[in-house]
Regions:
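Short glycine-rich anion-binding loops that position phosphate/pyrophosphate groups of nucleotides
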Residues: 12, 40, 72, 97-100, ...
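Hydrophobic/aromatic ligand-binding patch that stacks against planar heteroaromatic rings
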Residues: 114-118
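Short, glycine-/small-residue-rich phosphate/pyrophosphate-handling segment
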Residues: 126-153
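C-terminal accessory domains and tails appended to enzymatic cores
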Residues: 158, 162-164, 168-257
């Protein structure tokens, strides 16, 4: 019986520690190919490259097929599916991101967007993120990955939903369990530090932190804060159903000549 094909990508770059660990675990379940950005591409969201050439380089690695892409995380998935792979992968895995992707900040996430591209092509996918810490300790993360990847390769895993998995930094000590959660309303509050270069031109460095505004344990960021692995099932139907239900019958948008 042939092994399933698994596409592995991220937004931190093909040489990051997170993607190495994710690929090592995934390779226990199938044949993996890494197609990832050539450098850090965090915050690129669902952006694609339209007006510049996209460079592609095969990385010399005896044990693993790796392609480095001079483009966004979504570029990586599109190029892999359209040009590099001979067959459709059974699963797309994105990560492990160095830092959480929770709340409204997932709209900025290249990690989540690379996984969510799969919805458009009907392939199951998971985005993995590990809470940031000083040392970025990945100890015991493989246990979580093994459990979830095994589940995802089940025939019943949906191909119109992305699992957004966030792992607390306490995973190397203790976790309280795995919890199915909803996307919260937490924001990433940015601070833009204004500076001057040697030629007196203005430039900025961005910094910031997640603002916690909820206490419901069924919310992604709150579950993480309480030591749970959070799995948020994401779909990308962005229509406000509540607004439609409340306003569609009013007729105030009717146009009469």
């Amino acid at each position: 019986m042939s092994r399933p094909l698994i596409l592995v990508t991220n937004d931190d770059g093909y040489s990051s520690k997170g993607i190495e660990i994710l690929n090592n675990v995934a390779s226990n379940f199938g044949d993996t190919i890494i197609v990832a950005p050539n450098s850090e591409k965090s915050g690129k969201a669902h952006g694609i490259t339209l007006y510049d050439p996209i460079g592609l380089k095969k990385i010399d690695n005896q044990n693993q097929l790796i392609y480095s892409v001079d483009g966004t995380p979504v570029d990586c998935v599109k190029i892999a599916i359209n040009s590099l792979l001979d067959k459709k992968p059974k699963l797309i895995l994105s990560g492990i991101n160095h830092g959480l992707n929770v709340g409204r900040s997932i709209l900025y996430s290249g990690t989540v967007s690379a996984a969510s591209e799969s919805i458009m092509i009907g392939i199951p996918s998971i985005a993995f993120s590990l809470q940031k810490s000083e040392e970025m300790d990945f100890t015991n993360v493989d246990i979580i990955l093994e459990k979830l990847i095994k589940n995802a390769l089940d025939e019943d895993f949906p191909n119109d939903v992305v699992w957004n998995v966030n792992i607390p930094k306490t995973v190397n000590e203790k976790i309280n369990g795995i919890k199915l959660t909803k996307q919260g309303k937490s924001n990433f509050n940015e601070i833009y530090h204004k500076r001057k270069d040697p030629r007196n031109n203005t430039y900025f460095w961005v910094d910031g932190a997640i603002e916690s505004i909820e206490e419901d344990l069924d919310v992604d960021e709150v579950a993480i804060r309480n030591g749970y692995v959070s799995i948020t099932p994401l779909s990308f139907e962005l229509t406000s159903q509540k607004y439609l239900e409340n306003n569609q019958s009013k007729g105030f948008f009717d146009f009469e000549k």
